[in-house]
């Protein structure tokens, strides 16, 4: 048996889950279980410990496949057999005709996070694997993401008082499949995972060829880990720089920056300072500007104008930027006139 297909034993489950289910856990948890092998192994592993905090298993029925309801009921039966409570969460209402997978993902997390907060849970655990991480990195590379996006899925992400946790993110999917087989935990295979109509399904067909050239899932995941470390350092530098560059005199709801100070920053830091300043004045509801657009404005227009001592007025990411007299003011973009 290869290491990549070795089942997890109780000790490894404990090492990965004790922080969230053991004596030092901050509170209860919700386990997101679709019925596939990854999340089934998560549920089975949690049941084996046993948990010292309240555990709720949740399955989202997206209503996209005729068999989805029966699969959710199968998860409920296995959860009952393992001694864990279970809830089925239904995504109801009209479904979009385009970007269906994105909409389904957003609905899934909304339902799961709502349940976690309703339960007073401290954490929501999902069973994303090394394979998922590699696919995510490739998808974001295809979409033109920068270093932050190529950092992939975070092992732990804090959402207010709730932690979104992926305890299996460094494990190959094959180990979780082997675990279910060894333990006799039944699971289903979603045909949508290999559906060539969707980008992720198409990339799954390509990945064996990339691995043959050396671009394995493990190397893609390691790249994501390195980029997350680098991004954390750049983010800290950008936060400090934004504080240092802030100047008085901004309009209410706006921000004023020392433009010359912005121009002497390393380009990667300056880019993040501009993005943070825009996010601050626009607020959390606006869609952030795409990285390519940020780069075009900063490197193609703003920095050259600062160097020339010139003026500039443009919009970016929902903000109005005005460069004049060595200062850069940012304010929310005024609403467009109807007609």
Curated annotation (Swiss-Prot):
Q: What reaction is this protein's catalytic activity?
A: cytidine(34) in tRNA(Ile2) + L-lysine + ATP = lysidine(34) in tRNA(Ile2) + AMP + diphosphate + H(+)
Which EC class is the enzyme in? ligase
Give a GO biological-process term.
tRNA modification
EC assignment: the record states: 6.3.4.19
Protein residues bound to ATP: 34-39
Task: Write down what this protein is called.
Answer: tRNA(Ile)-lysidine synthase
Q: What top-level branch of life does the organism fall under?
A: Bacteria
Q: Name one GO molecular function term.
A: ATP binding
Give the location in the cell: Cytoplasm
Q: Which GO terms describe its cellular component?
A: cytoplasm
What family is this protein classified in? Answer: Belongs to the tRNA(Ile)-lysidine synthase family.
Q: What does this protein do?
A: Ligates lysine onto the cytidine present at position 34 of the AUA codon-specific tRNA(Ile) that contains the anticodon CAU, in an ATP-dependent manner. Cytidine is converted to lysidine, thus changing the amino acid specificity of the tRNA from methionine to isoleucine.
Keywords on this record? ATP-binding, Cytoplasm, Ligase, Nucleotide-binding, tRNA processing
Predominant location of this chain? cytoplasm
Q: What is known of its domains?
A: The N-terminal region contains the highly conserved SGGXDS motif, predicted to be a P-loop motif involved in ATP binding.
Which gene is transcribed and translated to give this protein?
tilS
Q: Does the keyword Protein transport apply?
A: no
The record ties this protein, via NCBIfam families, to:
lysidine_TilS_N (TIGR02432)
């Amino acid at each position: 048996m290869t290491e990549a297909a070795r089942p997890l034993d109780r000790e490894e489950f404990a090492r990965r889950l004790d922080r969230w289910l053991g004596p030092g856990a901050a509170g209860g948890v919700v386990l997101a279980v679709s019925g596939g092998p990854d999340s089934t192994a998560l549920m089975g592993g949690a049941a084996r410990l046993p948990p010292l905090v309240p555990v709720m298993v949740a399955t989202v029925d997206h209503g996209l496949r005729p068999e989805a309801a029966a699969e959710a009921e199968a998860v409920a039966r296995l959860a009952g057999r393992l001694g864990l409570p279970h809830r089925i969460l239904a995504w109801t209402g009209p479904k979009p005709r385009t970007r269906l997978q994105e909409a389904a993902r957003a609905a899934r997390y909304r339902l799961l996070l709502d349940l976690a907060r309703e339960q007073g849970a401290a954490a929501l655990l999902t069973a994303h694997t090394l394979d998922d991480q590699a696919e995510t990195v490739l998808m974001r590379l295809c979409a033109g993401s920068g270093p932050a996006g190529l950092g992939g899925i975070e092992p732990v992400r804090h959402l207010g008082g709730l932690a979104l946790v992926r305890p299996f993110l460094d494990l190959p999917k094959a180990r979780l499949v082997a675990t279910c087989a060894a333990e006799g935990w039944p699971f289903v295979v979603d045909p949508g995972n290999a559906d060539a109509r969707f980008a992720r399904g198409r990339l799954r067909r390509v990945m064996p060829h990339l691995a043959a050239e050396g671009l394995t899932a493990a190397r893609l995941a390691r790249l994501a880990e390195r980029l997350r470390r680098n991004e954390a350092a750049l983010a800290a530098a950008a936060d400090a720089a934004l504080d240092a560059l802030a100047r008085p005199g901004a309009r209410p709801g706006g921000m004023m920056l020392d433009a010359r100070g912005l121009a002497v920053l390393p380009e990667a830091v300056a880019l993040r300072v501009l993005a943070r300043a825009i996010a601050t004045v626009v607020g959390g509801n606006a869609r952030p500007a795409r990285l390519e657009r940020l780069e075009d404005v900063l490197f193609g227009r703003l920095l050259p104008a600062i160097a020339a001592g010139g003026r500039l007025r443009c919009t970016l990411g929902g903000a109005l930027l005005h460069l004049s007299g060595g200062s850069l003011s940012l304010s929310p973009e005024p609403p467009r006139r109807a007609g």
